[in-house]
Amino acid sequence: MVWEVKTNQMPNAVQKLLLVMDKRAPGMSDSLELLQCNENLPSSPGYNSCDEHMELDDLPELQAVQSDPTQSAIYQLSSDVSHQEYPRSSWSQNTSDIPENTHREDEVDWLTELANIATSPQSPLMQCSFYNRSSPVHIIATSKSLHSYARPPPVSSSSKSGPAFPHDHWKEETPVRHERANSESESGIFCMSSLSDDDDLGWCNSWPSTIWHCFLKGTRLCFHKESNKEWQDVEDFARAASCDNEEEIQMGTHKGYGSDGLKLLSHEESVSFGESVLKLTFDPGTVEDGLLTVECKLDHPFYVKNKGWSSFYPSLTVVQHGIPCCEIHIGDVCLPPGHPDAINFDDSGVFDTFKSYDFTPMDSSAVYVLSSMARQRRASLSCGGGPGTGQEFSGSEFSKSCGSPGSSQLSSSSLYAKAVKSHSSGTVSATSPNKCKRPMNAFMLFAKKYRVEYTQMYPGKDNRAISVILGDRWKKMKNEERRMYTLEAKALAEEQKRLNPDCWKRKRTNSGSQQH
């Protein structure tokens, strides 16, 4: 028995394939290579069989049917249905002689063919609106896309949305693009993207975009060579720099400023507009250009020459921007996007640590654990304590890639010293468990960040009074503002539990025994 396939035109519905008997004349030429169906099918439920052939029971299972050897088969599909061609020589005229295992294989082929039809671009199922929308999906970024901030702009591709402010040659600002969906397969760092984006737009939207040079939105600039030395927002400066004629005289001295990178000369933490900021001084490398002082956020990331991504507060940077960083030090050269020395981003050892771990944007704060392990290990070794077995996880690799322990630290290094002392207690507990301490909670992390600032604001108050003020501010904060500290505290707690599970049990046991 042979089946001819036709399609009924059904308005506003998916077209159904109806099986009808082939009544072609048996004398039709066999030389034509036709579309054929090489499967035996039972009668369709509720469909009257042809009188020329035997009627079959209305059963759900497929059964072998005796076919008339005088008839040939046609498998006809309308132009809007996907299909495949099979040579006529492969068609068996006597289907009853096909063994049972062959029928099973043909069943799979038949189901595959139906799946191909249903999922083809011409299928009405695939033409529904919910298949055409641009829905964000998780895709894995390659190691080369991790440093999209430092990648040179694409040469052959024409961007749909150009840079906000034009610059010259490779120095021009790099726009933020979506990561290509067909090139991600290696790294475990995840980002959000859309499959409908252009292949040429190969930038990940989870990385920050610079406004001018290597500075993000919200940074304030002060050029020492200017007579007035006024502070100006980086957005206003970049907007003025884009005016070729009007501001040519004023901005001429800053054209190409720091094109080979900005060398960090000094840094301090200060308060600006009621917010704790970093005040950094850079040297552009040329005497005629003069020095530059900037005020930026504590979590501002920088791409450092021969080092990779760096930050003064790696824990804050990874939570805020999703970028795992080394610690930046005096003497580091911060490069602008697209700099030739910034294209060798695969040499940045910091990302080698994360290649075998899958972190989604929701738990990106877990990467903080790895970034803090270098400080824990250095603090443990400097104090004379041996590194714990659990601490060998990846701290040594991270420490090697992020510089020597003797490098310069922040002016607020006392904060780090306290934090490291608390964090490194888990390492010391590998040899002396009684010294194990619980990690800091969200409020403690918040207080650690702002205690120096509030001490400077209220010089006459002692530490306890400062804690009360910090507590009042913490209560007034919104949940969105607390989230960063909550994620960081959660990551610390999970790592402490992993390294010292018995320490947590012992704490509860001791507290219970003291109550009795």
From Swiss-Prot:
Stretches assigned to coiled coil: none
PROSITE patterns: AXH (PS51148), HMG_BOX_2 (PS50118)
Any one Pfam family match given in the protein's UniProt record, by short name: AXH
Primary residence: nucleus
Stored InterPro entries: Ataxin_AXH_dom, Ataxin_AXH_dom_sf, HBP1, HMG_box_dom, HMG_box_dom_sf
Effect of residue 373 to D: Strongly reduces Sin3A binding
Domain AXH residues, every copy: 203-345
A GO BP entry: negative regulation of lipid transport
Locations listed in the record: Nucleus
Any one Gene Ontology molecular-function term assigned to this protein's record: RNA binding
Skewed-composition ranges (Basic and acidic residues): 166-182
Region span, Disordered: 150-182
Chain residues forming the annotated DNA-binding region: 436-504
Residue ranges with Low complexity bias: 156-165
Cellular component, GO, one term: nucleus
UniProt KW keywords: DNA-binding, Nucleus, Repressor, Transcription, Transcription regulation, Ubl conjugation, Wnt signaling pathway
Subunit: Binds TCF4. Binds RB1. Binds the second PAH repeat of SIN3A.
Chain's role: Transcriptional repressor that binds to the promoter region of target genes. Plays a role in the regulation of the cell cycle and of the Wnt pathway. Binds preferentially to the sequence 5'-TTCATTCATTCA-3'. Binding to the histone H1.0 promoter is enhanced by interaction with RB1. Disrupts the interaction between DNA and TCF4.
Name of the protein: HMG box-containing protein 1
Lineage, opening ranks: Eukaryota, Metazoa, Chordata, Craniata, Vertebrata
Name of encoding gene: Hbp1
